[in-house]
């Protein structure tokens, strides 16, 4: 009797049941149908083509642009007992010939290949001499010329339909709006493709945004809750990446920089350390992340605003891919708004593109200043309605206090108008607070009717008002004027008293714990590990690291954090008990079961 999809899921991958639409997708593709799968990061897309490849006759060919990721994906499959290989430029000629021989001999269940390799005449001829089970086209949004990850070679993959019409194809992506989905189906010539669209929601990620006061101090306070965790800290500039990685390292945190300005060898070495070691913090520009499949990233922090909600979703989505709790944390301030506006204005894009970018920034700003559930707003950006509140974002957990800021807003807008809409927030705040000085006198601004009318509020309070006016679209920065402020069409309603304005109260940042208390923080705290479980948790992770080094694979390839946590809670006494733990398949049980049981039994 042949194996069923559930048999393969349990015996090979060690999971008791499918999640979401996985089973329907697997059955559809196994039966020979084309499919487009839109599933969020961490949703289990890989199983949707891996299991059909094991159930169908022949070899599953996986097309992926992420060369750096292929080896880890193949290592993980081999550890699970699957015959897998990859073909890319990192292999020498002999190794490539060995893989081709295995393919022709029918010895492989799965072969990963880059699109540019697949499209060569030689490789296509090789495939015609091979029994192909299916084609899986990963990161399928790369086909869209409107997307930020456009890869021209993806548009040539129509050839798979032309030359292998009877072989099913499954296109997968974590990010595609309806327009991009239609483009994927058209460009790849998918035939009667069934579309499986999952929710964009990542319920295990906790979203939080704080006003920037002292970014370094705020980041350190945040990291105190992630002692020993792997995470990513995003910065806008290369210089800020280098500086942040340096001072984190000086503070005893294993932090590495990553940006396009580093030489290729350094980037590769830092990426390998991040993937293969526990507890590394990668400080990076957005150049880092595409193709990072590390499941146990416990936090993603932004020290600067991302470019759009899509960018924010994609970057924060690199946390918690194993389904365990992860934090998406960001600080931002008034300067971010000015900087991002200038970047859009000074780019070489056409006017239409700039308008789109500006609208995306406006949406992101309204998200950052929102007082309602963050998850509701985030999913709304992708056309999805969430029946909030979610209970797992800062606004749900600690609803922000608001205040009636109508009068201060009117004063601020009046000061911008009366000073000629030619100055930035710093000078306008000085006008409002009545700060006298030589420049103020030269400009004659000490004689404006708005001079000193805001003296009852300090600079910090006024900066908050201006930041929130910008986020609400009641002020705009002049793209040609180096951050100078101007009124918008919406400003009039406020000025004439037709619209009330409520703003978030400024919150004081939490003070960092003392050094003595810091030393008592435990690793794994972000996963809810208690102090009495600490020694066993550390022992399980130490064993995993040791085995990973011996086998030359990343630690998560041995077992995910989720599997170690399940062991910690189940306390299995024998191999039968361990086989029941989620993530422990037959091959891994045979290879590592005794080692992990010895550690668990020694701690009882």
Walk through the language-model features, giving the residues of each.
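Helicase motor core with emphasis on the C-terminal RecA-like subdomain
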Residues: 2-12, 16-20, 24-36, 40-46, ...
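Short, charged low-complexity linear segments at domain edges
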Residues: 352-384
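Accessory DNA-binding and partner-docking regions appended to nucleic-acid-acting proteins
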Residues: 1-8, 356-358, 385-604
